[in-house]
Swiss-Prot record:
Cytoplasmic side: 65-73
Self-association state and partner proteins as the record states: Interacts (via C-terminus PDZ motif) with RAPGEF2; the interaction is direct. Interacts with GOPC, MAGI3 and DLG4.
Chain ranges on the Extracellular side, renumbered to this chain: 13-38
Gene for this chain: ADRB1
Disulfide topology: 25-31
Role: Beta-adrenergic receptors mediate the catecholamine-induced activation of adenylate cyclase through the action of G proteins. This receptor binds epinephrine and norepinephrine with approximately equal affinity. Mediates Ras activation through G(s)-alpha- and cAMP-mediated signaling. In dorsal pons neurons, involved in the regulation of sleep/wake behaviors.
InterPro entries xrefs: GPCR_Rhodpsn, GPCR_Rhodpsn_7TM
One protein family per Pfam: 7tm_1
Main location: membrane
Protein name: Beta-1 adrenergic receptor
Membrane topology (UniProt): Multi-pass membrane protein
GO molecular function: beta1-adrenergic receptor activity
Subcellular location: Cell membrane; Early endosome
Amino acid sequence: ISALVSFLPILMHWWRAENDEARRCYNDPKCCDFVTNRAYAIASSVVSFYVPLCIMAFVYLRVFREAQKQVKK
């Protein structure tokens, strides 16, 4: 999942913002800023962080409940 979120959009230039500041930076080889568009930043954050967070919390909750059942037996 991380490879798809990171490499594919960057290679396909889906991350590029279209404002003037971003265009100047893209054309300047000395500019080191990574200017992204908002949709890419949100989608990347959700897929890379929030989806795994929810899955992990769900799995840990199930493990915790099962551990509580085992203690009661």
